[in-house]
A protein has these predicted regions:
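Ribonuclease/tRNase effector modules and their secretory precursors
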Residues: 1-82
Length: 82
């Protein structure tokens, strides 16, 4: 659990596979640069943060807000954002 958010097994795997630092995830969840509630058809919330330590790329963290605790279901560096 990070900052009150539960991580799905897929999210844990993606963190390791993509070398996403726990600090980047914590910062994105606690102080996102952009917050997109209901950003997809499943009603998930997308948290976005520009990570200076990773070439100013944007980290997108997708959270299911309909479960308790809220669950991080996927996270990735979004190449669509500049």
């Amino acid at each position: 659990m990070i900052n009150g958010f539960e991580l799905s097994n897929h999210a844990r795997f993606q963190m390791q596979e993509r070398n996403i630092q726990p600090l980047w995830l914590t910062t994105t969840l606690s102080a996102p640069d952009r917050l997109l509630p209901l950003a997809d058809p499943r009603g998930n919330t997308h948290y976005l943060k520009q990570i200076s330590d990773f070439g100013d790329r944007w980290l997108r963290v997708v959270v299911n807000p309909n479960v308790s605790p809220n669950r991080v279901i996927i996270l990735f560096f979004d190449r669509r954002l500049k």
